[in-house]
């Protein structure tokens, strides 16, 4: 292994173990997701155990590791398409949909923007948002 690769590996390790705190908009979105979920009948409650834990951490402003930010990015990438479903916006039938609730639990649109910004600054995604 050459010295450059070793340095790159160390930098990536540091970036993955360092933590950042979610900004206000992310905390508010996660808290809203928890409130909306709580008001739903059990049959319309969204959120896996992982998503609920993430929401509680975000809503409470707990530090988030870069490894977790990468997992959050993967969630947002997979579920971006959910925004096209019915029940995403107030006034639509089925609002708030399970997809909308879950999106908020992960920090919502502010969370998506924050995650991408943090990962870009850490050099963990490229300029197009592709995870490195």
Model features per residue range: what roles?
Residues 3-132:
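Extended terminal accessory/targeting regions
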